[in-house]
Amino acid sequence: LFDESLYPCEIYNEVRMAFIRMSRSVNKLINETTGLGYVFRTDFRLRPNPSVTPICLSIDSALGYYESAGRAWERAAFIKARTCAGDLTAGSRFLKKLQPFIWRKHLDFAAIKDAHDIRQQIKANNLNPDASSLLGQNIKLIEGGIRDIEFFAQTKQIIAGGRDDTLRASQTLKALKVLAKRGWLESNNLTVL
Protein backbone atom coordinates (compact mmCIF):
# COMPACT_ATOMS: atom_id res chain seq x y z
CA LEU A 1 0.00 0.00 0.00
CA PHE A 2 1.00 3.58 -0.41
CA ASP A 3 -0.53 6.81 0.84
CA GLU A 4 -1.54 8.70 -2.28
CA SER A 5 -2.38 11.82 -0.27
CA LEU A 6 1.36 12.46 0.17
CA TYR A 7 1.95 13.08 -3.54
CA PRO A 8 0.73 15.80 -5.93
CA CYS A 9 -1.78 14.67 -8.58
CA GLU A 10 0.59 15.44 -11.45
CA ILE A 11 3.09 12.78 -10.31
CA TYR A 12 0.60 10.24 -8.93
CA ASN A 13 1.02 7.71 -11.79
CA GLU A 14 4.80 7.97 -11.64
CA VAL A 15 4.76 7.37 -7.87
CA ARG A 16 2.31 4.47 -8.23
CA MET A 17 4.54 2.76 -10.83
CA ALA A 18 7.60 3.25 -8.61
CA PHE A 19 5.80 1.54 -5.70
CA ILE A 20 4.72 -1.32 -7.97
CA ARG A 21 8.32 -1.85 -9.18
CA MET A 22 9.60 -1.69 -5.61
CA SER A 23 6.99 -4.22 -4.44
CA ARG A 24 7.97 -6.64 -7.19
CA SER A 25 11.67 -6.30 -6.30
CA VAL A 26 11.05 -6.90 -2.59
CA ASN A 27 8.82 -9.88 -3.38
CA LYS A 28 11.52 -11.40 -5.58
CA LEU A 29 14.19 -10.90 -2.89
CA ILE A 30 12.26 -12.43 -0.02
CA ASN A 31 10.81 -15.34 -2.02
CA GLU A 32 14.04 -16.30 -3.77
CA THR A 33 15.36 -19.69 -2.70
CA THR A 34 19.09 -19.72 -2.01
CA GLY A 35 21.41 -22.22 -0.35
CA LEU A 36 20.13 -20.88 2.97
CA GLY A 37 16.46 -21.17 1.99
CA TYR A 38 14.17 -18.19 1.57
CA VAL A 39 13.33 -15.22 3.77
CA PHE A 40 9.55 -15.37 3.75
CA ARG A 41 6.83 -16.77 1.52
CA THR A 42 4.52 -14.09 0.21
CA ASP A 43 1.47 -14.53 -1.95
CA PHE A 44 0.49 -11.43 -3.88
CA ARG A 45 -2.81 -13.07 -4.78
CA LEU A 46 -3.89 -12.25 -1.22
CA ARG A 47 -4.75 -8.65 -2.03
CA PRO A 48 -7.87 -6.81 -3.15
CA ASN A 49 -9.14 -8.22 -6.44
CA PRO A 50 -5.78 -9.68 -7.52
CA SER A 51 -6.76 -10.46 -11.12
CA VAL A 52 -7.31 -6.79 -11.96
CA THR A 53 -5.36 -4.69 -9.45
CA PRO A 54 -1.67 -3.82 -9.33
CA ILE A 55 0.43 -5.45 -6.60
CA CYS A 56 0.71 -2.12 -4.79
CA LEU A 57 -2.50 -0.17 -4.23
CA SER A 58 -3.26 3.22 -2.83
CA ILE A 59 -4.78 3.21 0.63
CA ASP A 60 -8.04 4.68 -0.70
CA SER A 61 -8.30 1.99 -3.40
CA ALA A 62 -7.79 -0.78 -0.86
CA LEU A 63 -10.32 0.74 1.55
CA GLY A 64 -12.84 1.09 -1.28
CA TYR A 65 -12.46 -2.57 -2.14
CA TYR A 66 -12.88 -3.82 1.42
CA GLU A 67 -15.90 -1.56 2.04
CA SER A 68 -17.69 -2.75 -1.09
CA ALA A 69 -16.51 -6.30 -1.78
CA GLY A 70 -14.40 -7.55 1.15
CA ARG A 71 -15.01 -11.14 2.20
CA ALA A 72 -15.21 -12.90 5.55
CA TRP A 73 -11.82 -14.61 5.18
CA GLU A 74 -10.26 -11.19 4.57
CA ARG A 75 -11.90 -9.88 7.74
CA ALA A 76 -10.44 -12.84 9.65
CA ALA A 77 -6.98 -12.25 8.16
CA PHE A 78 -7.03 -8.60 9.25
CA ILE A 79 -7.67 -9.59 12.88
CA LYS A 80 -3.94 -10.43 13.06
CA ALA A 81 -2.73 -7.57 10.83
CA ARG A 82 -0.16 -5.10 12.07
CA THR A 83 2.27 -2.68 10.53
CA CYS A 84 5.78 -4.04 10.22
CA ALA A 85 7.67 -2.06 7.57
CA GLY A 86 7.60 1.06 5.47
CA ASP A 87 5.54 4.05 6.56
CA LEU A 88 4.28 2.72 9.90
CA THR A 89 2.09 5.78 10.46
CA ALA A 90 0.32 5.30 7.12
CA GLY A 91 -0.03 1.57 7.81
CA SER A 92 -1.54 2.22 11.23
CA ARG A 93 -3.90 4.80 9.74
CA PHE A 94 -5.02 2.24 7.11
CA LEU A 95 -5.65 -0.45 9.74
CA LYS A 96 -7.60 2.01 11.87
CA LYS A 97 -9.80 3.00 8.91
CA LEU A 98 -10.36 -0.70 8.21
CA GLN A 99 -11.79 -1.43 11.68
CA PRO A 100 -15.48 -1.02 10.63
CA PHE A 101 -14.91 -3.61 7.88
CA ILE A 102 -13.35 -6.11 10.29
CA TRP A 103 -15.61 -5.49 13.27
CA ARG A 104 -19.21 -5.04 12.12
CA LYS A 105 -21.70 -3.84 14.71
CA HIS A 106 -24.56 -5.99 13.46
CA LEU A 107 -24.73 -9.76 13.29
CA ASP A 108 -23.59 -10.74 9.84
CA PHE A 109 -25.36 -13.90 8.67
CA ALA A 110 -23.39 -13.87 5.40
CA ALA A 111 -20.17 -14.03 7.44
CA ILE A 112 -21.53 -17.05 9.33
CA LYS A 113 -22.34 -18.80 6.05
CA ASP A 114 -18.91 -17.84 4.65
CA ALA A 115 -17.25 -19.26 7.76
CA HIS A 116 -19.17 -22.51 7.35
CA ASP A 117 -18.20 -22.71 3.66
CA ILE A 118 -14.53 -22.03 4.45
CA ARG A 119 -14.59 -24.73 7.14
CA GLN A 120 -16.04 -27.22 4.66
CA GLN A 121 -13.34 -26.29 2.14
CA ILE A 122 -10.62 -26.81 4.76
CA LYS A 123 -12.07 -30.23 5.60
CA ALA A 124 -12.26 -31.18 1.91
CA ASN A 125 -8.62 -30.20 1.39
CA ASN A 126 -7.36 -31.86 4.57
CA LEU A 127 -4.43 -33.99 3.52
CA ASN A 128 -4.21 -35.69 6.92
CA PRO A 129 -7.74 -36.86 7.73
CA ASP A 130 -6.72 -39.24 10.53
CA ALA A 131 -5.69 -37.22 13.55
CA SER A 132 -5.83 -40.20 15.92
CA SER A 133 -2.05 -40.51 15.75
CA LEU A 134 -0.05 -37.30 15.61
CA LEU A 135 3.12 -39.11 14.58
CA GLY A 136 4.09 -37.83 11.14
CA GLN A 137 1.08 -35.51 10.93
CA ASN A 138 1.10 -31.86 9.93
CA ILE A 139 -0.07 -30.30 13.21
CA LYS A 140 -1.15 -27.18 11.35
CA LEU A 141 -3.44 -28.93 8.87
CA ILE A 142 -4.96 -31.92 10.67
CA GLU A 143 -8.49 -31.71 12.00
CA GLY A 144 -8.26 -30.00 15.37
CA GLY A 145 -4.84 -28.58 14.45
CA ILE A 146 -3.53 -25.04 14.55
CA ARG A 147 -5.53 -23.85 11.54
CA ASP A 148 -8.77 -25.23 13.01
CA ILE A 149 -8.14 -23.57 16.37
CA GLU A 150 -7.33 -20.21 14.76
CA PHE A 151 -10.38 -20.51 12.52
CA PHE A 152 -12.61 -21.30 15.51
CA ALA A 153 -11.38 -18.23 17.41
CA GLN A 154 -11.55 -15.88 14.43
CA THR A 155 -15.07 -16.98 13.51
CA LYS A 156 -16.35 -16.17 17.00
CA GLN A 157 -14.42 -12.89 16.96
CA ILE A 158 -15.95 -11.86 13.62
CA ILE A 159 -19.45 -12.73 14.81
CA ALA A 160 -19.29 -10.79 18.09
CA GLY A 161 -16.23 -8.53 17.96
CA GLY A 162 -18.15 -5.62 16.44
CA ARG A 163 -20.30 -5.34 19.55
CA ASP A 164 -17.71 -6.42 22.13
CA ASP A 165 -14.29 -4.89 21.61
CA THR A 166 -12.75 -7.09 24.31
CA LEU A 167 -12.90 -9.92 21.74
CA ARG A 168 -10.53 -8.14 19.35
CA ALA A 169 -7.32 -9.86 20.43
CA SER A 170 -4.89 -10.50 17.58
CA GLN A 171 -3.13 -13.44 19.25
CA THR A 172 -5.06 -16.71 19.14
CA LEU A 173 -4.34 -17.81 22.73
CA LYS A 174 -5.41 -14.42 24.10
CA ALA A 175 -8.51 -14.51 21.89
CA LEU A 176 -9.46 -17.97 23.21
CA LYS A 177 -9.08 -16.80 26.82
CA VAL A 178 -11.23 -13.74 26.21
CA LEU A 179 -13.83 -15.82 24.35
CA ALA A 180 -14.03 -18.13 27.39
CA LYS A 181 -14.27 -15.20 29.78
CA ARG A 182 -17.11 -13.67 27.73
CA GLY A 183 -19.07 -16.94 27.49
CA TRP A 184 -18.32 -17.88 23.88
CA LEU A 185 -16.23 -20.90 24.90
CA GLU A 186 -16.60 -23.28 27.83
CA SER A 187 -13.60 -23.27 30.16
CA ASN A 188 -13.00 -27.02 29.78
CA ASN A 189 -12.83 -26.54 25.99
CA LEU A 190 -10.39 -23.66 26.49
CA THR A 191 -8.09 -26.06 28.35
CA VAL A 192 -8.33 -28.62 25.54
CA LEU A 193 -7.64 -26.04 22.82
Predicted regions and their residues:
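A nucleotide- and high-energy phosphate-metabolite-utilizing enzyme signature
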Residues: 1-193
